[in-house]
């Protein structure tokens, strides 16, 4: 299944079989809890349409996205669609009209949801957004129960779930455990007042690997995003045996001999110490190759790591071909993935950038062709 065009210099191949296996392993690790597949930011840059369709076929409990526009991109999928990010006022009607599960962040928002749903002749299906320590969006878990009980009395509000989020689940620390306790306290008040929520979730990918307390009752579901693709946060445990789903490949655009003393690329950051065989790779930072590869990283050609020479350009990257003198224009270049005995991972790039894999995935450029294969 193709996510984009079938032709392009830079190709992102996502293995459907590995994606399915990762999903099944995640499901098995948290059973009997259900799994919500988080596919925000165009499935972390990998192409939401095809990936969402595959995961729905595999039985995901829901697909979660960050905003209304992302939900509309999958509106026809036969599954529960959850928006995690707070709605802007002018997005409310479309979200409710399409039956999306939407986040409820404060009482004033509940009043708006109720009025819109009443006008539309339907219910607003709400997941309470509970701030237990992220200080981002939602009801303050320390002072919210009276407002939540007021929300429950609004005739066109249906409270179907409640979720929260960890700022540091990869540590599995006391702060994260305290967040779980806060959630449980609010849940207990709701249940004591006859409010039973079908969707109760706090665990993200980091929590699945580091916080078993977030992956059992009273919670009903977990949310997973980056683990689906076989990637993990740089910090924390990797409890699940997941495999990378993607490769990024391009081709050599030109092979040339560059004389000793010549400089390579913008800023003249590399000077050839001798006559050198140099390859011009048809991919650059516009395609997602980090600038941090400049004079530090390598790409794989014919199974051989080829050091990046000079600064990564927008459209091209120059590499040394001294270890692959038979390389020619058109040869495959592996940016992420395996070639021969060597491999380069998303985590390798994240380490070079001093960032996390999420940023690396989301930085893959729009002109790179995504293919679910």
Predicted features along the sequence, with ranges:
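Alpha-helical scaffold segments that flank or form the walls of functional sites
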Residues: 22-24
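N-terminal nucleotide-binding beta1-loop-alpha1 segment
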Residues: 27
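Active-site anion/phosphate-binding pocket segments in diverse small-molecule metabolic enzymes
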Residues: 2-20, 69, 87-89, 106-112, ...
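Active-site-proximal beta-alpha core segment in soluble small-molecule metabolic enzymes
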Residues: 6, 10-14, 18-20, 31-201, ...
């Amino acid at each position: 299944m193709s996510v984009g065009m079938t032709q392009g210099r830079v190709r992102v191949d996502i293995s459907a079989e590995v994606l399915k296996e990762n999903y099944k392993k995640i499901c098995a690790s948290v059973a009997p809890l259900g799994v919500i597949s988080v596919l925000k930011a165009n499935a972390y840059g990998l192409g939401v349409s095809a990936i969402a369709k595959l995961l729905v076929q595999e039985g995901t409990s829901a697909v979660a996205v960050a905003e209304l526009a992302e939900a509309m991109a999958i509106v026809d999928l036969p599954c529960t669609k959850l928006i995690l990010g707070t709605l802007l006022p002018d997005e409310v009607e479309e979200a409710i009209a399409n039956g999306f599960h939407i986040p409820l962040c404060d009482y004033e928002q509940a009043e708006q949801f109720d009025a819109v749903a009443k006008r539309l002749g339907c219910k607003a299906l709400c997941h309470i957004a509970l701030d237990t320590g992220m200080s981002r969006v939602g009801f303050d878990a320390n002072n919210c129960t009276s407002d939540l009980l007021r929300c429950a009395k609004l005739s066109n509000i249906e409270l179907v779930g409640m979720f929260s989020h960890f700022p540091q689940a990869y540590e599995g620390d006391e702060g994260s455990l305290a967040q779980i306790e806060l959630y449980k306290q609010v849940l207990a008040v709701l249940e004591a007042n006859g409010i039973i929520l079908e969707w109760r979730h706090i665990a993200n990918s980091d929590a699945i690997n580091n916080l078993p307390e977030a992956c059992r009752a009273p919670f009903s579901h977990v949310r997973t995003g980056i683990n689906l693709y076989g990637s993990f946060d740089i910090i924390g445990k990797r409890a699940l045996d997941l495999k990378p789903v993607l490769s990024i490949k391009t081709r050599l655009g030109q092979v040339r001999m560059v004389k000793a003393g010549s400089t390579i690329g913008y800023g003249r950051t590399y000077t050839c110490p001798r006559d050198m065989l140099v390859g011009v790779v048809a991919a650059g930072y516009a395609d997602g190759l980090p600038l941090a590869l400049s004079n530090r990283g390598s790409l794989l050609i014919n199974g051989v790591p080829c050091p990046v020479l000079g600064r990564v350009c927008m459209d091209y990257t120059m590499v040394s071909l001294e270890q692959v003198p038979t390389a020619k224009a058109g040869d495959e270049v592996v940016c992420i993935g395996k070639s021969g005995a060597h491999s380069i991972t998303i985590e390798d790039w994240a380490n070079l950038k001093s960032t996390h894999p999420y940023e690396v995935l989301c930085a893959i450029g729009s002109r790179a062709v995504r293919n679910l294969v």
